[in-house]
Amino acid sequence: MTYYQITEILHDTLTDSRVDFTTITHGSIEDVDLARQTIFPLAHITPSTATLADKTISFSMNVAALDIVDYNKNNLRDETNPFYGTDNKIDVLSDLITRLQIAVDIIRRKLADRNVAIETSITNTPFVDRFENLLAGWETTLTIIVPNSAVNQGAC
């Protein structure tokens, strides 16, 4: 399986109706126009590393799931339940982690059909207020382990 095929599986999964991200981007997050309100929820794929072993290649891919946080104009001190604040960050984080869980499950099944492995333990890291236009979400790193076809085909 090639890098291109891996990114294609990630893209197709993130646009699947069960996951349903509005926009999927790839590369540097700085190249994405995050000020556009119509692109969210957004999934952004950034390649991290490719580790070459004797017979395998481990591709690490960072996937960031982002959405807009809506704020109301109320003062937090006036809220009857200040735990929930004056925004929907909890809703955004809950929704996006669910989308990522579903996506990882779909990706695992797609890769298993091709005898390709994904690391079993996946850590998701939340972020809030990381971007200037009130975005929150999760970042996860998927490590996909594929046979090194160049070695397996005797090219080396």
Report residues per predicted region:
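Small/polar-rich, solvent-exposed N-terminal microdomains that initiate assembly or binding
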Residues: 1-56, 110
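Short, charged interaction patches at domain edges and termini
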Residues: 1-12, 52-58, 109-156
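A solvent-exposed, charged loop/short amphipathic helix patch at secondary-structure junctions
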Residues: 71-94
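Ordered hydrophobic segments in well-structured contexts
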Residues: 40-46, 62, 137-139
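A short, highly charged nucleic-acid-interacting micro-segment common to nuclease
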Residues: 1-8, 89-97
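Short, well-structured alpha-helical interface segments that form or flank functional binding sites
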Residues: 5, 37-40, 58, 95-98, ...
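Short, hydrophobic/π-rich interface segment
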Residues: 91-119
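Short glycine-rich beta-strand segments
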Residues: 62-71, 145-147
